[in-house]
Amino acid sequence: FRLWDLCDQCCINLFRYTSYAYGKVREYAASDEEFTRRAGFALLATLAVGDKRASDDDFRPFLPLIERGAEDSRVRIGKAVNWALRQIGKRSRGLYPDALALARRLAAEGGGGGRGGGGGGGGGAKEGPAARRIGRDAVRELTLERIIARIK
């Protein structure tokens, strides 16, 4: 990928319909290449909205991946990480508390204390301001009364 919108459109209109979409989330998120890594989180956000058959347990294991992804200082990746976190939080009442807790932790602390491995990737990753920005933005959206009222 070379453009964020092409990356997102492929996730929204193609990749999410494949049988291997969930596996690709981790594979793409582990990449050091900016748009490939973005695709991992954009695909996760798309699945959180579009895969109505998936359970909360299908998404909960991705929260640590989001936490690691939030440490990446690249803006286009941060926006996709934020998107994934917010969509998982809005998916169900079962996921909402976990997503909101992660958002609050990111906003307060700026991430997971530099934990590595497991798909965090390198390529400009650093703890701190990016994670705090992602956390603050997600908390702001996830605590809106109109958003909370829509969560089922």
Segments the model singles out, each with a brief description of its role:
Residues 1-152:
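Alpha-helical scaffold domains
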